[in-house]
Amino acid sequence: MSSKEQKTPNEQVSEEMENTAEQQVEATQETGECVDPRVAELEVQLSDALQRERESLLRAKAEVENIRRRTELDVEKAHKFALERFSSELLPVIDNLERALDTADKTNTELTSMIEGVELTLKSLLDAVGKFGIEVVGETHVPFNPEVHQAMTMLESADHEPNHVMMVMQKGYTLNGRLLRPAMVAVSKAKS
């Protein structure tokens, strides 16, 4: 027998009871004997009990299957988003490294090696968090998306289409498609 054809003990007992009841009903009908009304009533009760047990078994199987599916989804979500709190704590570190690079005096030759070190550290950190599903939301000239952008201001602009991101004040981040922090942006509007 294949694994699909194998039956659980409950299924076997239920099937045997059903077969026995059907054989008794058929034997009674074939012989044409006059059946005691009490026997007929008991056969009806037996048939009803079998039907109830069969339905109960099906409901129990469905419930077990639903629990298994929910558990699989919960485990999958736990694996996928286990890093959410840790990732959120890393975002200020990334911001500080970016601010350090933005404010660094790149014309000072004495700071060149330090600036390169900070750039490499930032790149290494972004590569490391990227391996775990963290993505940067910080593009300009893209349509404003309230799911990943937080509009801080709206500015008139002839250079940008209306409702497009003009400037990113603070980058946002997603973890496996789930928003960790929205990007703070300036949004363009049509000139009046």
Swiss-Prot record:
Keywords: Chaperone, Cytoplasm, Stress response. InterPro entries: GrpE, GrpE_coiled_coil, GrpE_head. Residues 1-34 are annotated as: Disordered. Pfam families: GrpE. GO terms for molecular function: adenyl-nucleotide exchange factor activity; protein homodimerization activity; protein-folding chaperone binding; unfolded protein binding. It comes from the Bacteria. Participates actively in the response to hyperosmotic and heat shock by preventing the aggregation of stress-denatured proteins, in association with DnaK and GrpE. It is the nucleotide exchange factor for DnaK and may function as a thermosensor. Unfolded proteins bind initially to DnaJ; upon interaction with the DnaJ-bound protein, DnaK hydrolyzes its bound ATP, resulting in the formation of a stable complex. GrpE releases ADP from DnaK; ATP binding to DnaK triggers the release of the substrate protein, thus completing the reaction cycle. Homodimer. This is Protein GrpE. The gene is grpE.
